[in-house]
Amino acid sequence: MFKNYAASVLVLLALAGFSSVASAEDSLYQRLGGTYAIAQVDDYLVDMIYINKGLNANPALSAIHNGNPTSKAGFKQMLTNWVVQETGGPKIYQPDSFGRGKSLKESHPHLNISDREFDIIKTLALASFYQYNVGNHEIDQLMDDLESYRKVIVLNTKAEAFTSRLKKDGVEYRTK
């Protein structure tokens, strides 16, 4: 009887060890809760992006945000697909026949994004993460990943940059 108990304990300890190893290897996609959780945050973020007056001061962004009414739903889908793929989920971000789904470098030059506009988007992203109670570790990784795209997206370096500060759980997050 003791041998069976000891063997069971060893099996449980081994499984617990493998479980903690597996969780240490979870992708950001898995830690965020998968496609539906990402879609929920992206839905909120895109709604905030489309009504932001600072972003809509850029004529190219305003034309997109206030032009074709289907562009918002399409952008939500494309952003979700991109985030899913970039965080280690399924490879679902694909180019389409309309020219969407390209790399960030190919898809943003015509928007003439400034550092300030990039900072506004980062601030809105951070607020979205807080809105949906994304963990601090995941927020750090998401914000670092987003910042890594600045040099690819920002082409208008003449505009003044905007730096915001948000705090959560005593941790200060700076968007720049």
Predicted feature residues:
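Bacterial N-terminal signal peptides that target proteins for export
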Residues: M1-V9
